[in-house]
């Protein structure tokens, strides 16, 4: 049995014992710039959001980036939806069985940015045929532990999801692309066709 005074150890650090927000990872400038330049060259990019986006409270920024930069947004299949079905940017699950249009998107995309997710068995560990060889795969995670699971990606970045999305927005909003607009519109058409066929 142990007994301590109510103010025990109050003269030792930490002196302030209120809850604080967790520290956030800031992206390494050179790696970030390399990824932004890859996006700048892409014509058919896509974003796959995972649990890290939710934990980082970055859902609204994810949606804003998708709509503004014309990047279709998908959700990893084993996490609750980050965006509602009514969102213009949200296409569906990155799962070729539950959402067949994602198979065509993954097959034709030239750049896949996975934010806050894992390259696990449901993501085929980042390998073909789910992620074709001719597509660049980039993983962005907010903690080193998550990033360790994504070493097979073409590029990896340790970054808080919000920080990455803000940088992507700043970089991309002045770089419009007719090809990206057409790509984004095509994914919306495929989504609508799938919804209509599911309801018929």
For the regions a language model picked out, list residue spans one by one.
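Glycine-rich beta-alpha junction loops
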Residues: 1-5, 51-53, 80, 144
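Structural signature of the thiamine diphosphate
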Residues: 1-14, 35-38, 102-138, 167, ...
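Phosphate/pyrophosphate-binding active-site segments
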Residues: 11-12, 32-33, 37, 135-200
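Short, solvent-exposed amphipathic alpha-helical segments in soluble enzyme
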Residues: 12-13, 59-70, 127-132, 155-156
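An N-terminal, well-structured beta->alpha segment
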Residues: 17-33, 198-200
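Anionic-ligand anchoring segments at beta-strand to alpha-helix junctions in alpha/beta enzyme folds, i.e.
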Residues: 25-28, 34, 38-112
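Short, acidic/small-residue loops that bind anionic groups at enzyme active sites
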Residues: 70-79, 134, 138-144
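Short gly/pro/ser/thr-enriched loop/turn and capping motifs at secondary-structure boundaries
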Residues: 79-84, 120-121, 144-148, 164-165
């Amino acid at each position: 049995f142990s007994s301590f005074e109510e103010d025990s150890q109050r003269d030792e650090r930490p002196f302030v014992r209120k809850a604080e927000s967790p520290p956030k990872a800031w992206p390494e400038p050179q790696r970030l710039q390399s990824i932004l330049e890859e996006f700048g060259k892409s014509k058919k990019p896509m974003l796959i959001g995972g649990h890290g986006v939710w934990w980082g409270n970055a859902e609204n920024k994810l949606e804003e980036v998708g709509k503004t930069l014309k990047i279709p947004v998908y959700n990893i299949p084993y996490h609750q939806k980050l965006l509602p079905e009514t969102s213009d940017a949200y296409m569906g699950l990155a799962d070729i069985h539950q959402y067949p249009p994602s198979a065509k998107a993954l097959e034709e995309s030239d750049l896949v940015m996975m934010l806050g997710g894992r390259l696990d068995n449901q993501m085929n560990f980042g390998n073909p045929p789910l992620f074709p060889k001719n597509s660049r795969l980039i993983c962005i995670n907010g903690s080193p532990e998550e990033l360790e699971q994504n070493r097979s990606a073409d590029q990896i970045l340790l970054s808080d999801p919000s920080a990455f999305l803000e940088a992507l927005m700043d970089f991309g909003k002045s770089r419009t692309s007719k090809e990206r607009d057409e790509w984004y519109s095509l994914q919306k058409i495929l989504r609508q066709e799938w919804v209509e066929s599911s309801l018929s």
